[in-house]
Amino acid sequence: MNETELKALLSRIRPADSAAKAAAKERQSKLAKPPGSLGALEEISVRLAGITGRVCNRIEKTRIVVFAADNGIVAEGVASTPQCVTLAQAINMTRGKTGMSAIARDFGIDVEVIDVGINSDSVPETILDRKLGFGTANFSKQPAMTRSQAVDALAIGIEAAERAHNSGADALGIGEMGIGNTTTSAAVLACLLNLPVESVTGRGSGLTDEGFALKKRVISDALALHKPNGADVLDVLSKVGGFDIAAMAGAFIGCALFCLPPVAGGLVFLFAALAAVRLCKTVRDFIFLSHASYEIGYRAAAAELGMEPWLNLNMRLGEGSGCPVAFQVMRAACAAMNDMATFEEASINDNYLENIRNESAFCVKTV
């Protein structure tokens, strides 16, 4: 895929189905409960209707796709974890032995791990090979990747979403594995939102004070060197991004293209989602946020999208670890929408709710 083909593909993405959303809100108003009493579950069911075009939905078959890649910037000492852990954990994901994959296995969720840039030539066949390189370049010295590679990474993500759609998945969780990607994601967010590096950079997996100061300095120096254009997502991704972030952005785009509900599972995923929305604002209609990340920068990105995560569990693992839990929330939303009785079916006169219905504070809100 080249940039012209990417633009043509983005032009095919259509907004959420407003008629289906309106019909879903109408059904919510007839269910035997006080208006708005199921809170976010009502909003989720309405947004799902907009994505699928159906008022009633089921979230039965789910998948989490993990994009694994190394980041050359770790050569600058910005990560406390050795780079070899990327491959080790990618393998462990295929065995159900990481945080995300253990939870996913317990819930019966399919996990697909894709190598988009692991720095190893000994990646097992249980990991899908879509390698774009042996990690990105060290962006403190040169651009992380070429624009062509950034587009290729987006295409890999789009392909993964299409594959999930074709497999019959009802929702797709987006995951990652890549030592150093809190550094790349902070650099990307600082560019996209034009924010100071200090306000979007966290400690990652546990840097010391000295390491944390180094991390912020490395990012600041790289931004000064490359001067990424925040209005050009491909410029930002190619200069200071990662293969995993670009592929995740592509997965969000692919989900919008194939009307498959995607879940952003935490910090790095949210930044990738923001990049996808900057490429095509309509993608926002299709994104769900599972849980608030403990890491700094999450709030700024969520506010930019105008979205709130469903859960606050003080999580900061990454991997897409919030997605398995989020799928259960989506199932709950669908169960209420599909299976609750209406006032008429429950033989309840709902006239007593008229005043409550007239109060906007109790209306179903959708983003």
Write out the residue ranges for each language-model feature.
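N-terminal loops that bind phosphate or other acidic moieties
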Residues: 1-367
